[in-house]
Structures are given as C-alpha cells and as structure tokens.
Amino acid sequence: MKAALALEDGTYLEGKAFGAERGGLGEIVFCTSMTGYVEALTDPSYKGQILMMTYPLIGNYGVNREDFESDGVKVEGFVVKELCKNPSNWRSEMSVDELLKQYDVPGIEGVDTRMLTRKIRIYGSMKAAIGIGDVDREKLVRKAVEQPFISDIDLVDKVCVKEAKRFESDGDLEVVLVDCGVKMSIVRQLLKRGVNLTVVPYDFPAEKIKEMNPDGVFISNGPGDPARVKPTIETIRKLAGQIPMAGICLGHQLTALALGAKTFKLKFGHHGSNQPVKDFETGRVFISSQNHNFAVDTKTLPKEFEVTQINLNDHTVEGMVHKDFPLITVQYHPEAGPGPHDTYFFFDRYVDMLREYR
C-alpha cells in the first residue's frame, strides 16, 4: 500500500506503508542508534513524536517482548529507509510490521531518511504527518501544519501509571518512583541494587510521599515539555532537601525547574545511543543513551547547583548535584535500554547516597 510523509515546511515524500493502515501526526525526530528499535518504539519518552531511524535497514532481528520498555508502542509513527520483512533471530516473536499493526501505529518505508535527517539537523525538528493510501498532498501538509506543537500537549498524563504500583527486590531500601513515563530498564536497574519501588503517578502529592517515609525519591524520564508537568515540579519543590532524590532525563529537567532554573527546547533534540558525555570529577568521557528535546539552561542554574557533566557535542548540561543536600540528576539515560552500559554507576551512586543519609 502507498504512503506519504509531509512536513510542516511543505516537504512531501512518497513511500510504502507498513503497520497500521491509518495516518499519524507528531513531531518528527531522528534516532542515530543502529539497533535497539524495539526499545525505542516502546519508550514512553517518544510519545507525541514520529520516530525516524537514521540507520538504513531496520527490523533484521525482529521483535521480542522482553525488550519492551513499557506496555506497548508509544511513538505516533515510524519512518525507515528499508524495513526487513523476514527477520531472523532465535529470540524473535514477530516482525516490526506485525508489532505496529498490533498497537495501531502507522509506518512508512522507502523514503530518503538521509535527506530528512540533514533537513532536521539544519532547520530543527518539525511537525509531520503520515498518510496512507491515495493521499492529497496539500491536505497532508495542512494536517502537519495545523496540529498542535509538542509543547502545547500534556503528554506525561498519557503514559504514566494511574495508581500506585509495587515492585519488590531482595533488599531493604524503600524508594518512591514518580512516574512521568518510566522505562522498565530503570526499574530493573534499581531492583538489581536491592531497592523496593513504589511507583506513583506524576501528580501524586508530596504529603502522601512523606507519609510513606521512603529512603529516597526518584523522578523518572518522560515525554514533552517539562514546564507543563507542574504537579511533579511542585512535588520536587516540597521534598527537595527533606528526602534524598534523583532524577533522569525529564526528571532532571523538572528538578532544575523546581529549584529555580529554566529549560529550553533543543533544535533537534538528542535521540540515540552514541552521545558523548564528559564527567568533570574524573575527566572521563562516557558514551550515553539519550532521548530528549529539552535541556536545562546553564545560565539560570542557582549557585547551589554544581554541573558535574556536559555533552561534548553541544555543551548542554548532562549532570548536576546540589551542594547543600542529597540530590543528583542526569540528562542522559544511565540504564541504556538500548545503549552502552558506561553509566550504570549512576544507580550505584544513588544507592550509596540513600544508605549514607538513611
């Protein structure tokens, strides 16, 4: 079946459809990972976005549910140069086409992803629309233009838990994880380190968290503009300095906002598992997995914060600690899923901090 992709600047490309036989709307972003497409498709941080892979052949090893980062596919659409129709891997349960059909998500292949990546890199992320079948070019471009900006949509509410959920480990530490769109890899890394988790919705009141008397609080990753997630910002503001706290990705941005800093939208975001991060304490450079469209504005950080890590590509903030109380955050994804394991140590630091202040 025919398909088409339109961008808000009038770019129009024709290709072949796969996945759900319906259209899709979202902000198009490119991901530079060569593998890990299953984890990316199921990452809640991609909610509201059409995901395009820069690697030209996707789907070779199929799909395995053990690699899911959530309860299903979260992207609004999937764009690839070429889709493998006959995956071959002993773990494979289905193809990418079958996965997208199952979760009613459209895809398009056969478009020039290299050209699109260069365009987004030069002009920034854009609103986009996928059309299936006989598509009217002008109407599809209009759909791309007229959809709301990602900054105007409350995306976290669409991907977080609706009631508290419990995960038990073989340890004795108790942590409340505020779910803004948490990846299962984060949950698994904490459980491995003897942390029992109570996962609560993003708007769970700070007072109720205090009543639970946890050893620590953890603010998760998630999609969209951090400035829209006001309930979590308020929770962080009330709990910071009283309970040891950590944040990842969106949680990092929300923590900065709660304590007086500002955030801004990146030109085309960081999406992929090959982002270099420099750690100032050790002087080492780590390769990290990242998925975010916003960043913390260094110039607005209160003096109580110390920037511990930066991105070597654009020098944006990648890590922070508070000088006066136990609070650590990182912009990248230390749990990987997918990506290198260079930064697993973040979870060790968090657990050490919990035990120190217990």
From Swiss-Prot:
Name recorded for this polypeptide: Carbamoyl phosphate synthase small chain
Originating organism: Archaeoglobus fulgidus (strain ATCC 49558 / DSM 4304 / JCM 9628 / NBRC 100126 / VC-16)
Residue ranges of domain Glutamine amidotransferase type-1 in the record: 174-358
GO biological process, one term: 'de novo' pyrimidine nucleobase biosynthetic process
Keyword tRNA processing: no
Record carries keyword Ligase: yes
Domain of life: Archaea
Role this protein plays: Small subunit of the glutamine-dependent carbamoyl phosphate synthetase (CPSase). CPSase catalyzes the formation of carbamoyl phosphate from the ammonia moiety of glutamine, carbonate, and phosphate donated by ATP, constituting the first step of 2 biosynthetic pathways, one leading to arginine and/or urea and the other to pyrimidine nucleotides. The small subunit (glutamine amidotransferase) binds and cleaves glutamine to supply the large subunit with the substrate ammonia.
HAMAP family per UniProt: CPSase_S_chain (MF_01209)
EC number assigned by the record: 6.3.5.5
One Pfam short name: GATase
Catalytic reaction(s) noted: hydrogencarbonate + L-glutamine + 2 ATP + H2O = carbamoyl phosphate + L-glutamate + 2 ADP + phosphate + 2 H(+)
Region CPSase, annotated ranges: 1-172
CDD domains: GATase1_CPSase
